[in-house]
Design a protein with these regions (language model features):
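Active-site neighborhoods and metal-handling regions in enzymes and metal-associated proteins
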Residues: 1-121
């Protein structure tokens, strides 16, 4: 689980970035259910971030599997050919990082179900 904390007054740009990342996460989580290709989940978040003008500031995958280790395959990425399966636990962690300004990442773990997912964090 990752949260972003701001110390001090919030600038409009930071508020916009936070809102974009939060919405990107909601869109990705909305795609999760057994049988969906992981790249579709990635695109739901990545496409939204790109549409808001921040695409070049999101340089990693949307998430990854969680099991005995914190970071496990399969990856929720744009190149993944894997499908979500009931019972999988994965992270959904879109982010925007702007050099010289700062960044926002919001990460939650979800349990994949047949009809969607259960947010665990």
């Amino acid at each position: 689980m990752t949260r972003t904390v701001l110390l001090g007054a919030m600038k409009d740009k930071f508020a916009d970035i936070y809102t974009v990342v939060r919405e990107a996460q909601k869109r990705a989580i909305g795609k999760i259910r057994s049988g969906v290709r992981m790249s579709e989940v990635d695109f739901a978040a990545r496409g939204y971030i790109h549409s808001r003008g921040y695409g070049k500031y999101f340089g990693h995958s949307v998430g990854h599997g969680v099991g005995m280790k914190v970071h496990e395959l399969p990856s929720v990425s744009r190149t993944s050919k894997d499908f979500l399966k009931k019972g999988m636990i994965t992270t959904i962690e879109p982010a925007i990082y702007i050099p010289g300004f700062g960044g926002v990442r919001i990460e939650d773990m979800v349990l994949v179900t047949n009809k969607g997912c259960e947010i665990l964090t």
